[in-house]
A protein has these predicted regions:
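N-terminal extracellular/periplasmic Venus flytrap/periplasmic-binding protein-like
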Residues: 10-12, 23-32, 40, 174-265, ...
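Active-site-proximal alpha-helical scaffold in enzymes
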Residues: 84-116, 165-194, 254-261, 326, ...
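Condensing-enzyme catalytic core mediating Claisen C-C bond formation in acyl metabolism
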Residues: 1-25, 139, 222-289, 293, ...
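Conserved active-site "lid/cap" helical segment
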Residues: 1-61, 65-73, 80, 160-172, ...
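Conserved catalytic cysteine-centered active-site region
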Residues: 55-110, 151-157, 221-247, 328-355, ...
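Flexible glycine-/small-residue-enriched beta->alpha junction loops
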Residues: 109-163
């Protein structure tokens, strides 16, 4: 079977909650990435047969967010589109499904990624349709209800992370130190232009004129000196805070996939090949350590050991999520999230899975590495991982 390759990709800068991208919808963010990724790949819009975009918070976005994004990107009506929701793994699962489609012969060229405007997630009235007959009605936050809370218990994802941090013995100081390192790396990456080849600028119109958003917003909103003084977020005497957890964010990303044979036939120059991918699933309360199993499955499929991997992108939903596989696989901290992670950059939930693959590719290019693994935890007890190799 011919290899599946990533020809190119693009992402938006990540905006903070109610920040620089607040007026832009998820499909609009997705459209910018789809259009730019196709252009960077050296393809025409008519070459793409299918678009798969993750989106975790679709309420109020109107019919078919991926279809909207595809059409706004200028693709023809004959192009198929599907929106998928695997929570924080949506963008990565989109890439995995695209690879499966190409392997199966269902399509030759697929755009896959994710998009999210957490800022614009609406409030919902679950009982309004049947009639709020008497007394007080409850308004629920779509972001919390469908994104950040466990479906069975209603507990916030961070409360499970706090439990696991306690179980693993991670201290507040350890997690704060991790978050500070992530922030320092992210600030350096932005200042040095390390993300420039990833990002497609987004123009935001306002009464004050047009503003071009082309840099990640959140690394410069944080005050390192205040990190040790922040209050616990999920338990009175807890150790997880807003700083050593990921930020609520807006953003999108997209990758162009095809087979190595098709890329050669069309004269394309792929950036990387997908070597393996895997999903690991366990009890919902243990989602924060699920990446450990996903990584092991991918290592088994590739025949690599952890020390063969040049760089890692392990999504920082919480600092402790990344710390677990770092400890279990004895990873060199200098090889993990070298440009910072979600604690500093943000975590637009539908996009992060594809975003970290794109960031990993460019980090490998910049540092002269070849092999990389990207992974992230997923609410409900799951994780996905993708192993890539630069071409």
């Amino acid at each position: 079977m011919t290899d599946i390759v990533i020809v190119n990709g693009a992402r938006t800068a990540m905006g903070g909650f109610q920040g620089s991208l607040a007026s832009v919808t998820a499909p609009e963010l997705g459209a910018a990435c789809i259009k730019e990724a196709i252009a960077r790949a050296g393809l025409q819009a008519t070459d793409v047969e299918e678009v798969i975009m993750g989106c975790v918070l679709p309420a109020g976005l109107k019919q078919g967010p991926a279809r909207q994004a595809m059409r706004q990107a200028g693709l023809p009506d004959s192009t198929g589109a599907v929106t998928i929701n695997k929570l924080c793994g949506s963008g990565m699962k989109a890439v995995m499904q695209a690879a499966d489609m190409i392997k199966a012969g269902s399509a030759e060229i697929v755009v896959a990624g994710g998009m999210e405007s957490m800022t614009n997630a609406p409030y919902v009235l679950p009982k309004a349709r049947g009639g709020l007959r008497m007394g007080h009605g409850e308004i629920k936050d779509h972001m919390f209800l469908d994104g950040l809370e466990d479906a069975e218990t209603g507990r916030l994802m961070g409360s499970f992370a706090q439990d696991m941090a306690n179980t693993r013995g991670y201290t507040r100081e350890q997690m704060d130190d991790f978050a500070i390192r992530s922030l320092e790396r992210a600030q350096k990456a932005v200042n040095e232009g390390y993300f420039a080849d990833e990002i497609v600028p987004v123009t935001v119109s306002s009464r004050k004129g047009d503003i071009v958003v082309d840099k990640d917003e959140q690394p410069f909103n944080a005050n390192i000196a205040k990190i040790p003084t922040l209050r616990p977020a999920f338990a009175k005497d807890g150790t997880i805070t807003a700083a050593n957890a990921s930020s609520i964010s807006d953003g999108a990303s997209a990758l162009v996939l095809t087979s190595a044979d098709n890329a050669a036939a069309k004269g394309l120059k792929p950036l990387a090949k997908i070597v393996a991918y895997a999903t690991n699933s366990q009890h919902p309360s243990e989602f924060t350590i699920a990446p450990v199993g996903a990584i092991q499955k991918v290592l088994n499929k590739t025949g690599w050991n952890a020390q063969d991997v040049d760089l890692w992108e392990i999504n920082e939903a919480f600092a402790m999520v990344t710390m677990c596989p770092m400890d279990d696989f004895k990873l060199d901290p200098a090889k993990v999230n070298i440009n910072g992670g979600a604690c500093a950059l943000g975590h637009p939930v539908g996009s992060s899975g594809s975003r970290i693959i794109l960031t990993l590719i460019h980090a490998l290019k910049r540092t002269g590495g070849k092999k990389g693994i990207a992974t992230l935890c997923i609410g409900g007890g799951e994780a996905t991982a993708v192993a890539i190799e630069l071409l």
